[in-house]
């Protein structure tokens, strides 16, 4: 199942990126939402178990909604997508909190990275400073808790998700361009597939 899921997501993501490069909006949306639906399907096929599994599934479903909203370049859609992904990270964090053994040292390290990212973004954020800071706080907490879970797929998935969001931020606030999505989206879908595999 893993190989099939990876192949399906890779194919749909390739369609999305190809369409994005050519301005084919309908195909771009279909490829991205198809790839996003696939990671939810993987979780359901695995069989969702316990508070951890249901929390992860909630995060995955919210992520699909966020992906749909972020297909638009409008500021309102970006804010709505940011809010939806914030809720997804809350769901992940709550799921991980029940099984994590968090480390204060890891908390300091992750917080230091996030502060460096915010310093990099700060001059470019303008009116988006408050929502971006709030989002960064939540994803930092999510990553910290994930790194305290004794499940390699959860640790790797959370770290890749965090890394992919750096590319989203670069695309939105620093240097927009397809290159951000060519690098960032594979990281994002790898992250979500890893988390989907952790539902049981």
Write out the residue ranges for each language-model feature.
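Polytopic alpha-helical membrane-helix bundles and their juxtamembrane interface segments
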Residues: 1-200
């Amino acid at each position: 199942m893993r190989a099939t899921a990876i192949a399906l997501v890779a194919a749909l993501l390739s369609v999305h990126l190809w369409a994005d490069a050519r301005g084919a909006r309908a195909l771009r949306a279909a490829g991205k939402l198809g790839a996003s639906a696939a990671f939810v399907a993987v979780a359901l096929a695995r069989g969702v178990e316990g508070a951890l599994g249901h929390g992860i599934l909630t995060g995955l479903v919210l992520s699909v909604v966020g992906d749909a909203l972020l297909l638009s370049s409008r500021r309102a859609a970006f804010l709505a997508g940011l809010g939806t992904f914030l809720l997804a990270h809350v769901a992940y964090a709550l799921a991980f909190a029940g099984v994590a053994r968090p480390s204060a040292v890891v908390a300091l390290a992750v917080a230091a990275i996030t502060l460096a990212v915010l310093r990099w973004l700060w001059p470019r954020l303008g009116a988006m400073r408050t929502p971006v800071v709030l989002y960064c706080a939540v994803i930092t907490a999510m990553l910290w808790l994930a790194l305290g879970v004794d499940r390699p797929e959860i640790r790797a998935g959370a770290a890749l998700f965090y890394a992919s969001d750096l590319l989203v931020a670069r695309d939105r606030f620093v240097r927009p361009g397809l290159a951000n999505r060519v690098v960032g989206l594979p990281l994002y879908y790898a992250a979500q597939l890893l988390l989907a595999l952790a539902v049981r």
